[in-house]
């Protein structure tokens, strides 16, 4: 009798640990740290976590949970969005690193992206005037993947201005 109870308790403990690990890899600090590393690399000050922006991001991510569509919210904040395919445990750092990887395609001198490339996610990450971020992550329904969004205040990517 004791063995099945012990096995069930052990299984529940392992499941709880896995949930905590997943949440631990998507904490506010897991978003803030890679943002600040990228910003520090170009001499820009740190961003801090905003619960207001987090709530906005979570509300929008919840709206994308059924389709996981890479579509911007149209909200009043700067915004980066990320989609990861089903079957992988996409984390906060995966999204931020994806955006920061666009640095190689950004030319500061001309304030443009390389031909045929995207770099606006990177420039939003390092936008000097942006001082607060809030992010959210959802696992989309029907095996559609993971949707991650970060919002920025003040918003960046203002035409004609350099990010730093």
Curated annotation (Swiss-Prot):
**InterPro entries associated with the record:** Allrgn_V5/Tpx1_CS, CAP_dom, CAP_sf, CRISP-related, V5_allergen-like
Q: Report the SS bond pairs.
A: 68-140, 113-119, 135-150
Give every SCP domain span: 34-152
Q: Which GO terms describe its biological process?
A: defense response
> What are the protein's UniProt keywords?
Disulfide bond, Pathogenesis-related protein, Plant defense, Pyrrolidone carboxylic acid, Signal
Q: Where does the sequence pass through the membrane?
A: none
- UniProt superkingdom: Eukaryota
Q: Which GO terms describe its cellular component?
A: extracellular region
Q: Point out the coiled-coil segments of this chain.
A: none
Q: Which Pfam families match?
A: CAP
Q: Which residues carry this modification: Pyrrolidone carboxylic acid?
A: 25
Signal peptide from the UniProt entry? 1-24
Q: Which Gene3D superfamilies match?
A: CAP (3.40.33.10)
Report the sequence similarity comment from the record: Belongs to the CRISP family.
Q: Give the function comment from the record.
A: Probably involved in the defense reaction of plants against pathogens.
Q: What is this protein called?
A: Pathogenesis-related protein 1
Q: Which organism is it from?
A: Hordeum vulgare
